[in-house]
Design a protein with these regions (language model features):
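Flexible, low-complexity linkers/stalks enriched in Thr/Pro that connect modular domains
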Residues: 1, 103-112, 202-203
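Solvent-exposed loop/turn segments flanking beta-strands in beta-repeat/beta-sandwich domains
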Residues: 23-47, 138-150
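Short, solvent-exposed loop/turn segments at the edges of extracellular beta-sandwich modules
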Residues: 88-97, 188-193
Length: 203
């Protein structure tokens, strides 16, 4: 029995996982967590459990663990990967190696943030006023817009098939905002990678 959480679709940064493994009959013999990509397998967690007592009555029958997978630390490439949990019990079957339980989960490694840049050049904004910016995003962008301090003004696609990735955004600056209030273009992809970049404007 193996339970692993969470089960993300994407891996963009260091993520913490919790694992529960159990075998009520023979008890646990070994546990291994690994991530495989293009034939290259990297071990994340590996643990063995000794046979103790009559019929392993004093052995480990349930184990909980927490671990982190960081794609940068493990030098994972961009693209598909398979997260694997392999478990053996103390059964005499399988030539004495025990019964094997294999749990797998497919995910995509994506650590590259989306690209975004302004197409319009001059953006003059009065305090309490609004402005329009036209900008371009990369194809992996899911959400985008303008951040005025902590307020997000969402952008909308404007290019259609002729100019994919082109967006417009109407944004406003509060009347009591400081002259140096940060105004940034913002984009996020499916994996949760974010880009925040300045563009020419004057409040």
């Amino acid at each position: 029995e193996v339970t692993l959480a969470p089960l993300p679709e994407y891996l963009s940064e260091g993520s913490r996982f919790t694992l529960e493994a159990g075998d009520e009959k023979g008890g646990l013999r070994s546990l291994r967590v690994s991530i495989e990509q293009a034939g290259r397998e990297t071990t994340v967690v590996e643990k063995t459990f000794p046979y103790q007592g009559l019929f392993n009555s004093d052995g480990v029958h349930r184990h909980e663990a927490a671990f982190e997978i960081d794609p940068l630390v493990l030098n994972l490439a961009q693209g598909r990967a398979e997260l694997k949990v392999e478990l053996f019990d103390h059964s005499r079957r399988g030539g004495g190696d025990g019964n094997r339980t294999l749990f797998t989960h497919n995910l995509t490694v994506d650590t590259i943030p989306p690209a975004i840049r302004a197409l319009t050049r001059l953006h003059y904004i009065n305090q309490g006023g609004s402005c329009l910016v036209v900008y371009q995003t990369s194809s992996d962008t899911e959400k985008s817009g303008v951040l005025v301090d902590r307020m997000l003004f969402p952008g909308f696609s404007s290019g259609g098939k002729a100019s994919p990735g082109s967006h417009v955004c109407y944004f406003a600056v509060p009347h009591d905002a400081a002259v140096k209030t940060p105004v940034l273009l913002w984009a996020e992809d499916r994996a949760g990678n974010e880009t925040r970049t300045p563009f020419y404007h004057r409040v």
